[in-house]
């Protein structure tokens, strides 16, 4: 038996079937770095229209997690797809480097600033720690295949950046948005300082729970407002912090709640007590109120500014409205001490109530106070309760175990205490109304993002930007000791400070002798030692990064972060940008969801469902992680697990194997000399290129709209259905058996080349490592990297009136699927071994006959059978079942003819040639003659 293998055009490629991503990807990263790929992209696209995606800075602490990976991969896909679209799309990554978590890590190593080490040394250690964290995270982000200016990232702790933060504060001062005021903060009596939220732990605590009556001062006013007859009504509050009652300045009701007056006897004493109607039954029982009558309801909205008597002090307090008032517990009325609670403080600001906190830094009440003067907070509950008993205003005393804020260091209960702070005012210079206006100009994706940030800005309180921390950018201001006014030369002073910080970092401020800048005035001014909220640091990146770097600009085209950033970075960026430039810092804001496991549960070490990106790239490769990010609809929760990633691996193999088939069949093809013009190509080849053009247009639109999961679907379906399920199977015979330089084969190779060029670009933003590997295996001239390319422009369309256009081939595909199903049935019934051992008879109506007869003898190459015959539908045997195609029935017969040793078709002329008794006539023509001629398939 002669071996005809050498006469076939068998596929050849250096592109391996086994991806080996976890081994190959690091080498590819090294290559990109050595060739300075990012800089080459910048040079190649210089002068093109800009697209600026501004990177929200992750915090420089700890290893990156799966959420970080999602965020960076999404950004990378956008930047790469924008580059393909012809934009100059620089990507400058950044890190948030100041703040409490870093302080806590450094404290564990060197002790607290001002105790075991001086503040300057502590800041130096913080800077060193943050630098190490940045280095580790940077390495991990690069490992994901993210291209960016990794050699020049922005760090909020860089001296120049710190200086520009101070300059941005100066602009906010210039524009009239900064004010000094009081705000309640968590205060640790043991630390003697304010605590940030991250330093607060919640533990169970037993506290006194008291119901307290606030008698109405003007009964006639109450009766007139409520329509309720009463002689000595009182409004009742419930509190677990009796010690705060000396600072009470109001009682809050909800304007939309209804209230009733309960008249009855309590321990033999007649009482008239106003409470929320929804809680009345519970309170009657809890208090043991007897002989109760209940009034008609009165709306809370009618009680505003009703005067009440303080329950044990010589003072009157008003009724105010509070949206925070609920009927979840208590009485539906809330004791309001603006100096001791955030909600109370907000209400107090609306009503201009004094946010007094009579508690000193050391936890002692001021000496001049009645009842509690000179006492420590921890000792004040009992005398307050006794005073309430004496005045007859204690309705009920009980104990309650509840969750209460504690100091994370000392494990002791905290108090809320109003202290002097610095604020960005929402209304002083109209910042909040401007924010609402500007929101309408921004595109929010998904659309619900707009409603979310609008809701968060509704009645937003002033932004407290001051922190009593060591590791942060200073609020570099001088305040007059007598008037509390800022120095009149503040703008010039801020610039002088910024210039010093640019050279020496924030220590330049903390070490500064005010006389160096103020001269003889130094004694009249205090140097502010507070630091800025880290949300201010990251919030002004539009000024410190976009405005300062030549290749960037503000506003950015896109901000992209997790859905929690409507409260965080999106908002701090918007407010600071409006305060500085009176415009939003972004044109579009895109939000992604959080990662959960396959059951929708949050990632948790205790549950054991954490997927670490480091494990994924070490095991499966970063491209698998990237494919998962692309395939998942990121606008909701993103499910990930080992099983899900394994499924992604299967999808990846489909795309890789399809690409490998294309490359292996381009062996020996030189585009410059071998490619055919569209009019020279076979009909099927022209169709598949037209189909690729159609898919490319869809994919480009999907990338432009950030619909990445649909990009994945289009990419996967084109590989699996258009190519794998139709075109590639059909062309194998022509590709392998026709003469190497025949029109039939070169037509096919031309189509494969165009498809490969397009396909590699479609996948490049997603499967970045794999795309580069494919690209370097393409024949012909290439750029230095696929990431220097733009969308492929070599695809072409079929004319709308083409003889064998889209509609024709779509119907042929339907018929082929019907044939495939019939062949599978025959194979299952062991009638045939494979499709080439079969002959099919297609019983067709007039419409199907007109369609399929146009392929002539080449119909068998489409059905991939040894023969394909058309007969009238009326002649179909009765036992033949209908197919999925109207007017088509399929009969599968085992071929009686001998099998050609070269093409494996069963043909009647096998054996008719004496020199090649094992070949069919077609193969003899291809081996020794002029070669067969194909027209369609």
UniProtKB/Swiss-Prot annotation:
Q: Which domain of life is it from?
A: Bacteria
Cofactor(s) of this protein: Zn(2+)
GO CC list: cytosol
State the family named in the UniProt similarity comment for this chain: Belongs to the class-I aminoacyl-tRNA synthetase family. IleS type 1 subfamily.
> Which compartments does it reside in?
Cytoplasm
Does the keyword section mention Phosphoprotein? Answer: no
Q: Spell out the molecular function terms from Gene Ontology.
A: aminoacyl-tRNA deacylase activity; ATP binding; isoleucine-tRNA ligase activity; tRNA binding; zinc ion binding
Keyword Disulfide bond part of the UniProt annotation? no
Q: How does it assemble?
A: Monomer.
Entry binding sites for Zn(2+): 900, 903, 920, 923
In chain numbering, motif 'HIGH' region lies across 58-68
Q: What does the entry list as the binding residues for ATP?
A: 605
Which function does this protein serve?
Answer: Catalyzes the attachment of isoleucine to tRNA(Ile). As IleRS can inadvertently accommodate and process structurally similar amino acids such as valine, to avoid such errors it has two additional distinct tRNA(Ile)-dependent editing activities. One activity is designated as 'pretransfer' editing and involves the hydrolysis of activated Val-AMP. The other activity is designated 'posttransfer' editing and involves deacylation of mischarged Val-tRNA(Ile).
Recorded name of the encoding gene? ileS
Name-wise, this protein is Isoleucine--tRNA ligase
């Amino acid at each position: 038996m002669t071996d005809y293998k050498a006469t076939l055009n068998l596929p050849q490629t250096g592109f391996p079937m086994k991806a080996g991503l976890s081994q190959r990807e690091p080498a590819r990263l090294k290559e990109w770095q050595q060739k300075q790929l990012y800089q080459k992209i910048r040079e190649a696209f210089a002068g093109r229209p800009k697209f600026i995606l501004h990177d929200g800075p992750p915090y420089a602490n700890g290893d990156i997690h799966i959420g970080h990976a999602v965020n960076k991969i999404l950004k990378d896909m956008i930047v790469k797809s924008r580059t393909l679209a012809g934009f100059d799309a620089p990507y400058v990554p950044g890190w948030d480097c100041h703040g409490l978590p870093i302080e806590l890590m450094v404290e564990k190593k060197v002790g607290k600033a001002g105790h075991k080490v001086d503040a300057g040394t502590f800041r130096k250690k913080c800077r060193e720690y943050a630098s190490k964290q940045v280095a580790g995270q940077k390495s991990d982000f690069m490992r994901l295949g993210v291209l960016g200016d990794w050699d020049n990232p922005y760090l909020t702790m860089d001296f120049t950046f710190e200086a520009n933060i101070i300059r941005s504060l100066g602009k906010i001062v210039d524009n009239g948005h900064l004010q000094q005021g009081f705000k309640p903060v968590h205060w640790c009596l043991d630390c003697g300082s304010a605590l940030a939220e991250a330093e607060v732990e919640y533990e169970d605590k037993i506290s006194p729970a008291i119901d307290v009556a606030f008698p109405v001062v003007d009964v006639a006013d109450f009766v007139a407002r409520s329509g309720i007859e009463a002689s000595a009504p009182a409004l009742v509050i419930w509190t677990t912090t009796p010690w705060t009652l000396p600072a009470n300045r109001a009682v809050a009701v909800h304007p939309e709640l209804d209230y009733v007056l309960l008249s009855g006897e309590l321990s033999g004493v007649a009482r008239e007590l106003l409470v929320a109607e929804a809680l009345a039954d519970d309170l009657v029982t809890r208090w043991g109120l007897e002989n109760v009558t209940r009034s008609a309801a009165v709306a809370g909205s009618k009680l505003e500014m009703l005067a009440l008597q303080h329950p044990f002090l010589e003072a009157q307090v008003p009724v105010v409205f509070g949206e925070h008032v609920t009927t979840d517990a208590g009485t539906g009325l809330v004791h309001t001490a603006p100096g001791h609670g955030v909600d109370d403080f907000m209400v107090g600001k609306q009503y201009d109530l004094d946010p007094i906190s009579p508690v000193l830094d050391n936890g002692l009440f001021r000496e001049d106070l009645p009842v509690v003067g000179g006492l420590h907070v921890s000792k004040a509950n009992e005398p307050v309760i006794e005073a309430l008993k004496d005045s007859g205003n204690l309705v009920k005393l009980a104990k309650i175990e509840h969750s209460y804020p504690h100091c994370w260091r000392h494990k002791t209960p905290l108090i809320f205490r109003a202290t002097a702070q610095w604020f960005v005012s929402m209304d002083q210079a109209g910042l909040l109304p401007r924010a609402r206006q500007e929101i309408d100009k921004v595109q929010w994706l998904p659309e619900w993002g707009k409603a979310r940030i609008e809701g968060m800005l509704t009645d937003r309180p002033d932004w407290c930007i001051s922190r009593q921390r060591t590791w942060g950018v200073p609020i570099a201001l001088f305040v007059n000791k007598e008037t509390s006014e800022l120095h009149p030369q503040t703008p010039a002073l801020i610039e002088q400070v910024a210039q010093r910080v640019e050279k020496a970092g924030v220590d330049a401020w903390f070490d500064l002798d005010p006389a160096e800048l103020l001269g003889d005035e130094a004694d009249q001014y205090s140097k502010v030692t507070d630091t800025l909220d880290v949300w201010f640091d990251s919030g002004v990146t539009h000024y410190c990064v976009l405005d300062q770097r030549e290749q960037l600009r503000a506003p950015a085209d896109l901000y992209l972060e997790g859905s929690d950033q409507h409260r965080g970075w999106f908002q701090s960026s918007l407010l600071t940008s409006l305060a500085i430039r009176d415009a939003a810092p972004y044109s579009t804001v895109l939000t992604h969801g959080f990662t959960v496991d396959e059951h929708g549960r949050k990632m948790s070490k205790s549950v054991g469902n954490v997927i670490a990106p480091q494990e994924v790239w070490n095991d499966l490769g970063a491209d698998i992680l990237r494919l998962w990010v692309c395939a998942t609809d990121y606008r909701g929760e993103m499910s990930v697990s080992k099983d899900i990633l394994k499924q992604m691996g299967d999808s990846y193999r489909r795309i890789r194997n399809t690409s490998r088939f294309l490359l292996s069949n381009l062996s020996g093809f030189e585009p410059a000399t071998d490619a055919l013009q569209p009019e020279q190509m076979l009909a099927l080849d022209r169709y598949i290129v037209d189909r690729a053009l159609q898919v490319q247009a869809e994919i480009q639109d999907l990338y432009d709209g950030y619909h990445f999961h649909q990009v994945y679907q289009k990419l996967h379906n084109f590989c699996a259905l258009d190519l794998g399920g139709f075109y590639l199977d059909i062309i194998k015979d022509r590709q392998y058996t026709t003469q190497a330089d025949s029109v039939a084969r070169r037509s096919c190779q031309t189509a494969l080349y165009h498809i490969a060029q397009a396909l590699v670009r479609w996948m490049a933003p997603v499967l970045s490592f794999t795309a580069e590997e494919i690209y370097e295996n393409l024949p012909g001239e290439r750029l230095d990297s696929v990431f220097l390319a733009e969308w492929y422009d070599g695809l072409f369309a079929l004319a709308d009136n083409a003889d064998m256009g889209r509609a024709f081939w779509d119907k042929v595909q339907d018929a082929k699927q019907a044939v495939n199903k019939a062949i599978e049935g025959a194979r299952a019934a062991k009638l045939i071994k494979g499709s080439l051992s079969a002959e099919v008879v297609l019983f067709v109506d007039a419409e199907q006959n007109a369609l399929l007869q146009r392929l002539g003898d080449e119909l068998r190459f489409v059905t991939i059978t040894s023969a394909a015959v058309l007969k009238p539908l009326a002649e179909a045997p009765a036992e033949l079942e209908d197919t999925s195609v109207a007017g088509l029935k399929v009969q599968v017969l085992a071929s009686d003819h001998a099998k050609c040793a070269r093409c494996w078709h069963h043909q009647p002329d096998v054996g008719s040639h004496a020199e090649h008794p094992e070949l069919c006539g077609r193969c003899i023509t291809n081996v020794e003659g002029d070669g067969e001629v194909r027209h369609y398939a």
